[in-house]
């Protein structure tokens, strides 16, 4: 879907605060409420807007550890392994990557014990040859609201 300037402005408003009313977005963008509603509907139908949610402070929820885990998978079973890993509620992202490893996992944990259990579960999965886990010391930026 091609986005024009109005679409981008609407999206920026939604990214700023998804609770903005259509009337508020229309006022901010300088278009009618009908335009805002129809553009949002088109972007939802096209799959550009996948949903609306709150942005949580994970540390305040007790998730003290963020990890980046590289995995190497054998026998061409990468997609199967990734789908299984993605089911874990602590996993925030699973990515195919280039380089020495096959995939990267971003996950958050409340304790070292939880991280240890997760690592053991990974190594118990068929076709995982090895893992390499990096514990994040400081999060400088974590924001997936791109536009």
Regions found by a protein language model. Give the residues of each.
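A compositional/biophysical signature of low hydrophobicity enriched in polar/charged and small residues
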Residues: 1-147
């Amino acid at each position: 879907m091609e986005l024009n300037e109005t679409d981008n402005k609407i999206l920026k408003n939604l990214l700023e605060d998804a609770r903005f009313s259509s009337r508020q977005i229309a006022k901010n963008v300088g278009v009618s409420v009908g335009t805002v509603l129809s553009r949002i509907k088109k972007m939802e139908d096209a799959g550009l807007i996948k949903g609306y949610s709150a942005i949580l402070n994970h540390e305040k929820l007790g998730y003290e550890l963020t990890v980046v885990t590289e995995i190497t998978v054998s026998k061409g079973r990468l997609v199967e392994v990734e789908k299984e890993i993605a089911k874990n509620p602590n996993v925030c992202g699973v990515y195919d990557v280039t380089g020495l490893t096959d995939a990267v996992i971003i996950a958050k944990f409340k304790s070292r014990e939880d991280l240890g259990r997760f690592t053991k579960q990974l190594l118990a999965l068929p076709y995982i040859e090895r893992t390499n886990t990096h514990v994040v010391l400081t999060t400088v930026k974590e924001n997936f609201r791109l536009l």
